[in-house]
From Swiss-Prot:
Attaches a formyl group to the free amino group of methionyl-tRNA(fMet). The formyl group appears to play a dual role in the initiator identity of N-formylmethionyl-tRNA by promoting its recognition by IF2 and preventing the misappropriation of this tRNA by the elongation apparatus. It comes from Synechocystis sp. (strain ATCC 27184 / PCC 6803 / Kazusa). The keyword Protein biosynthesis applies. Pfam families: Formyl_trans_C (PF02911), Formyl_trans_N (PF00551). This is Methionyl-tRNA formyltransferase. It comes from the Bacteria. GO terms for cellular component: cytoplasm; cytosol. It catalyses: L-methionyl-tRNA(fMet) + (6R)-10-formyltetrahydrofolate = N-formyl-L-methionyl-tRNA(fMet) + (6S)-5,6,7,8-tetrahydrofolate + H(+).
């Protein structure tokens, strides 16, 4: 029986915890998660998704503000005498004191093909940068930020219309399977850790407010990648208001073969449509049942789904029908 302590916080970490809880050869001794946070109306304290799963399973949950400084939690972790600490999107760095506690090490599930996209937002930046492939890497943790020796990898393609939610869900499931296999192989002495090549490392920093602002002078593909990579947070100025851009479709013969079947009617309509000329950020036409087409710095972009202030998300077609006056986001 492999004794583990699980460190994790968001939805992305839940499938891995569930896989550990459901495995007959793995004993989850405790879960460490970020403290409950106040959210929503009434500012109620909301537990993390990982905590909710652990509580339902009857597993002890520890929630220190700073795990490396909480003597009570450190003592509990040491007393566990675990074989592994498993870390998935926990949200805090582990101290050297913690890293040496488990018998076989601290194993991290990272949402990228290391050494590419080390850091806090690997999925977001992989999509925003237009990568066509990503994946999950398990690694033995060291004191650095995602710099530990690699164990196993699994890959997944990124389609032109895949967004953060779709890729995140896919990697969460594949990462859970990969983690279980990693623990089994490590326990059996069948894995040889592979050091990362520093010269190949790239980074995925925390997102800043400016990352969500759309610059219409960029190309249609760059804006599309930004929107789907940082979904659903990208936005543009709309008069004196802010319009959230939830999803887009890049238009052009080079993109249509890469679009799912449901967009083929859109492709046909676009190729048969006479568009006006315009400056980046101008609406240069409307495709029936789909929505407005915008000029960008290079190419045309359809607004598939948007969210006006104070309203629920709506299709680009509904948005344009409700705002018939001239609209520009320039």
């Amino acid at each position: 029986m492999m004794k583990t302590v699980f460190f994790g916080t968001p939805d992305f970490a839940v499938p891995t915890l569930e896989a550990l809880l459901g495995h007959p050869d793995i004993d989850v001794l405790a879960v460490v998660s970020q403290p409950d946070r106040r959210r929503g109306r009434g500012s109620k304290l909301i537990p993390s998704p990982v905590k909710e799963v652990a509580v339902q399973a009857g597993i002890p949950v520890w929630q220190p503000e700073r795990v490396k400084r909480c003597q009570e939690t450190l003592a509990k972790l040491k007393n566990c005498q675990a074989d592994f600490f498993v870390v998935v999107a926990y949200g805090q760095l582990l101290s050297p004191e913690i890293l040496v506690m488990p018998r076989l090490g601290c194993v991290n599930v990272h949402g990228s093909l290391l050494p590419k996209y080390r850091g806090a937002a690997p999925l977001q930046w992989a999509i925003a940068n237009g990568e066509t492939e990503t994946g999950v890497t398990t690694m033995l943790m060291d004191e650095g930020m995602d710099t530990g020796a690699m164990l196993l990898k699994t890959t997944t393609p990124i389609g032109l219309m895949d967004n953060l939610t779709a890729i995140g869900d896919r990697l969460a499931r594949s990462g859970a399977e990969l983690l279980v296999q990693t623990l089994k192989d490590l326990d059996a002495g069948q894995l040889q850790p592979i050091p990362q090549t520093e010269t190949e490392a790239t980074y995925a920093p925390l997102l800043k407010k400016g990352d969500f602002v759309i610059n219409w002078h960029r190309s249609a593909l760059e804006i599309h990648n930004q929107v789907r990579g940082f979904a659903p947070a990208c936005h543009t100025a709309w008069g004196e208001q802010i319009l959230k851009i939830i999803s887009t479709v890049p238009l052009g013969a080079e993109f249509f073969p890469l679009l799912p079947e449901k967009y083929q009617d859109l492709a046909t309509a676009y190729l048969n449509y006479s568009l006006e000329a315009g400056e980046p950020g101008n609406i240069i036409g409307t495709i029936k049942n789909w929505g407005p087409v915008l000029e960008t710095g290079n190419g045309h972009l359809l607004l598939e789904q948007v969210q006006p202030p104070g309203k629920k998300p709506q299709s680009g077609w509904d948005f344009i029908n409700g705002n018939r006056s001239t609209i520009s986001f320039a």
